[in-house]
Amino acid sequence: MPIQVEVWGDYACFTRPEMKTERVSYDVMTPSAARGLLESVYWHPGLRWMIDRIRVCSPIRFTNIRRNEVKDVISANKVKAVMNGGTGELYLAASESIQQRAAMVLRDVHYVIDAHFEMTPAAAPGDNHGKFQDIVKRRLERGQCYSTVSYTHLTLPTKA
């Protein structure tokens, strides 16, 4: 059963893997990003989203932004050492480990995603296409989501 979702936002970043340190977006939304966006609206182990088509509804425009990011991570080894009686700090002071990074992102994005879903072996006996279709439609109409809907970064929210 096909589902069509219109999404738009001020900014989007579909990061190219070959750009290591600075984020540079693909020109359009990737199928995996569209699948992730739909999963943020409704996720269920008995359902797998399949992207059929992504239509670009606005001109492709880029802009450069600078973002503050935390450069450090808390290592698992450090956590284990403290749990076993060692000493150390188990926090990151964002003000001490902040760095600015440039990103080339898309601006004023607008897409229509055509998708469908397939049932997986993890579906319960009472699960069926009609049930999932109704749940997804209801969640989209009410603006509900399973997790925060965003274009790759939680700081780049989207509207559906």
Predicted regions and their residues:
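N-terminal, Lys/Arg- and Ser/Thr-rich interaction peptides
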Residues: 1-21
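Short, well-ordered alpha-helical segments
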Residues: 29-46
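Generic beta-structure capping elements
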Residues: 8-10, 116, 159
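Extended, compositionally biased
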Residues: 41-117, 123
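Short, cationic low-complexity segments
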Residues: 132-151
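Short histidine-centered catalytic/ligand-binding loop motif
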Residues: 21-27
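A short secondary-structure junction signal
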Residues: 123-129
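Conserved small/polar residues in nucleotide/adenosyl-binding loops
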Residues: 152-158
